[in-house]
Amino acid sequence: MPQLDTSTWFTTIVAMILSLFILMQLKFHKYTYPMNPVLKALESTSFPCPWETKWTKIYSPLSLPQH
């Protein structure tokens, strides 16, 4: 049975890792990172409600006039 030749494995593995590292560096270099993130000031927007603009009266049964 022939012996497995492993003399080139080290060169192959190192070349593969080096090429993957270079490819990843090129990918990260093309990515545009956002500039310093700044928190936006949260402004509370109030929507006009119809019940805020007019006066309403609630009639309870006890306050109704007697018949």
Swiss-Prot record:
Disulfide bonds: none
This protein's record includes keyword Transport: yes
TM spans (from-to): 8-24
GO molecular function term, any single one: proton transmembrane transporter activity
GO biological process assignments: proton motive force-driven ATP synthesis
Keyword Secreted attached: no
N6-succinyllysine modification, residue list: 54
Residues spanning the signal sequence: none
Membrane topology of this protein: Single-pass membrane protein
GO cellular component terms attached to this protein's record: mitochondrial membrane; proton-transporting ATP synthase complex
Top-level taxon: Eukaryota
PTM sites of type N6-acetyllysine: 54, 57
Assigned keywords, A-Z: Acetylation, ATP synthesis, CF(0), Hydrogen ion transport, Ion transport, Membrane, Mitochondrion, Transmembrane, Transmembrane helix, Transport
InterPro entries: ATP8_mammal, ATP8_metazoa
Location in or out of the cell: Mitochondrion membrane
Role of this protein: Subunit 8, of the mitochondrial membrane ATP synthase complex (F(1)F(0) ATP synthase or Complex V) that produces ATP from ADP in the presence of a proton gradient across the membrane which is generated by electron transport complexes of the respiratory chain. ATP synthase complex consist of a soluble F(1) head domain - the catalytic core - and a membrane F(1) domain - the membrane proton channel. These two domains are linked by a central stalk rotating inside the F(1) region and a stationary peripheral stalk.
Family named by the database record: Belongs to the ATPase protein 8 family.
Subunit structure: Component of the ATP synthase complex composed at least of ATP5F1A/subunit alpha, ATP5F1B/subunit beta, ATP5MC1/subunit c (homooctomer), MT-ATP6/subunit a, MT-ATP8/subunit 8, ATP5ME/subunit e, ATP5MF/subunit f, ATP5MG/subunit g, ATP5MK/subunit k, ATP5MJ/subunit j, ATP5F1C/subunit gamma, ATP5F1D/subunit delta, ATP5F1E/subunit epsilon, ATP5PF/subunit F6, ATP5PB/subunit b, ATP5PD/subunit d, ATP5PO/subunit OSCP.
Name of the featured protein: ATP synthase F(0) complex subunit 8
Name of the gene: MT-ATP8
